From Swiss-Prot:
It comes from the Eukaryota. InterPro entries: Calcineurin-like_PHP_ApaH, Metallo-depent_PP-like. The keyword Signal applies. This is Uncharacterized protein C1840.07c. GO terms for biological process: energy reserve metabolic process; polyphosphate catabolic process. GO terms for molecular function: endopolyphosphatase activity.
Amino acid sequence: MSSLGKLLKLTLLGILLSFSCKFVFGYFNVNQLFDHEFIKVFPNFKGNVEAKIKYPTVVYAIGDIHGDFPNALDVLSAAGVVSPVFPHEWTAGNATLVQTGDVVDRGPDTRKLFRWFNDLHKQAEKHGGRVVRLLGNHEFMNAKGDWRYVHPGDKASYPEPSEENRIIDWGHSGEIGNLLLSEYNVTYKDNTTGSHFMHAGLSPEWAYREETVNELGKELLSHFMSREKIPEYLEDFWAIEGPMWYRGLAQLSEEEACEVALNVTKTLNVNRLVMGHTPQFHGIVSRCEGRILLIDTGLCSAYAGERAVLRISQNDTDSIVEAVYRGKIVKL
């Protein structure tokens, strides 16, 4: 069949599947199908596939996982981000997945999760997608030797002497330590959807310093790994109102939170602030007409909260923001 014939066949297939899946499931990401199938039909194509489709990507976000691989797999596979079948590879095409930190503590699967997300990152890149991995306060705590919430199964995953080997792993030369310093950040801004992601959140004062947050976070992490006294200029970063611990957007009254959110979104030039850190056990919470999205749903077994993934997609006029649960999708 000629290339034109293949393209016409592919286009017709996409239209039919789009309508079918929209009626059956209520949602369908035709962009991801087109991207994936176009490359299969035209493997030598050198142009920009994304330029051929109107809305090139969907953004997913998952909050605190806390050492629970089965529950993370369950909700990410339900959302269509990964395969439910071993080895649980990336299935979201050219989408972006943001994990907002706190992979570690409370559960046994820390090492498995870090390796899995690293593999997903590599797999996503092959399809034009990406996996953005952010640092939570618990990653910093483990780097500095604060192991109060470490699950016994996490320690047992290391060969003896397990504690010594775990210290090495979380240091500069360790697998996890090196990964955190080289691949992870504190904040991520998605310009396509106008969304700002991080673990805890930014106060108005820190919003003005947002461009320095990732660099300061890496500096602090490195000091913690070295067990060094942190410099005075980093103390505010680790303070209760700093970027790794701030809970104002989750815990302030509605009026106060909305005032802060309006201030911060204007400063950052974004539409919404997405964060984990403060558990919302009944599901993803939208505050202030969607300016604040709280996505830590306590999905780990230690908390037994709802399992949910945030999904942000585009239409002609706006972003479509949804909470994806197993068996249902809730528009936020």
